[in-house]
């Protein structure tokens, strides 16, 4: 049980996919302008990352390895992620049309989010079992969502602040992301895996 808790904390805080592994930067910068959109994207990504992680484990364990076709791993994981994203898009469209409109193009772009594919591939490379795959996928998703929501709230505050003209827009966003990354470095000694 402790191992699973350490894996979760390590994935969320210590080895955050956005701030440490630099995966998922496109939605991190693109969807973080408004808090409401960031929360929606975080929830959708959490669902997709967790489900894609589980599906990737099952495909690897019950299809690719038994048939000896591990070389098709990346292509099959992309296909699995695309199916999971389409399922998520249908669910969001039916349950919350407002959120569906807010997320716009970013919902289908979860398919190309490198963090989703990265989590699936790292699960296999680190030889996680089924439970660890679920926790790793969920932890990566929670870490992504946490950073996205924190960054969106900071960007909203910066938008109304008196920022010098040369720093407006992407410049101050990158500086803020860097400072946020430094803050998360404080968690480095928290968990050793």
Swiss-Prot record:
GO CC term (a single one): plasma membrane
Transmembrane segments: 5-25, 39-59, 67-87, 102-122, 134-154, 171-191
Gene Ontology biological process terms in this record: electron transport chain
Keywords, alphabetical: Cell inner membrane, Cell membrane, Electron transport, Membrane, Translocase, Transmembrane, Transmembrane helix, Transport
Enzyme class: translocase
Localization per record: Cell inner membrane
EC number: 7.-.-.-
Source organism superkingdom: Bacteria
Pfam families (alphabetical): Rnf-Nqr
Function: Part of a membrane-bound complex that couples electron transfer with translocation of ions across the membrane.
NCBIfam families documented for this protein: PRK05151.1 (NF003481), rnfA (TIGR01943)
Family: Belongs to the NqrDE/RnfAE family.
Self-association state and partner proteins as the record states: The complex is composed of six subunits: RnfA, RnfB, RnfC, RnfD, RnfE and RnfG.
Protein's UniProt name: Ion-translocating oxidoreductase complex subunit A
Organism: Vibrio cholerae serotype O1 (strain ATCC 39315 / El Tor Inaba N16961)
């Amino acid at each position: 049980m402790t191992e699973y808790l350490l894996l979760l904390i390590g994935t969320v805080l210590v080895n955050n996919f956005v701030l440490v592994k630099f995966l998922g930067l496109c939605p991190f910068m693109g969807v973080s302008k408004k808090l409401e959109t960031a929360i929606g994207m975080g929830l959708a990504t959490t669902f997709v990352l967790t489900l894609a992680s589980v599906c990737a484990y099952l495909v690897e364990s019950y299809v690719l390895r038994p048939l000896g076709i591990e070389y098709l791993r990346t292509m099959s994981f992309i296909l699995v992620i695309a199916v999971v994203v389409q399922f998520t898009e249908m669910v969001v469209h039916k349950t919350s049309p407002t959120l569906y409109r807010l997320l716009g193009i970013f919902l289908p772009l979860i398919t190309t989010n490198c963090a989703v594919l990265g989590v699936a591939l790292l699960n296999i490379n680190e030889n996680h079992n089924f439970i660890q795959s679920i926790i790793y996928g969920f932890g990566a998703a929670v870490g992504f969502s946490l950073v996205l929501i924190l960054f969106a709230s900071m960007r909203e505050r910066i938008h109304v602040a008196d920022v010098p003209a040369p720093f407006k827009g992407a410049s101050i966003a990158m500086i803020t992301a860097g400072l946020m990354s430094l803050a998360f470095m404080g968690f480095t000694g928290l968990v050793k895996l």
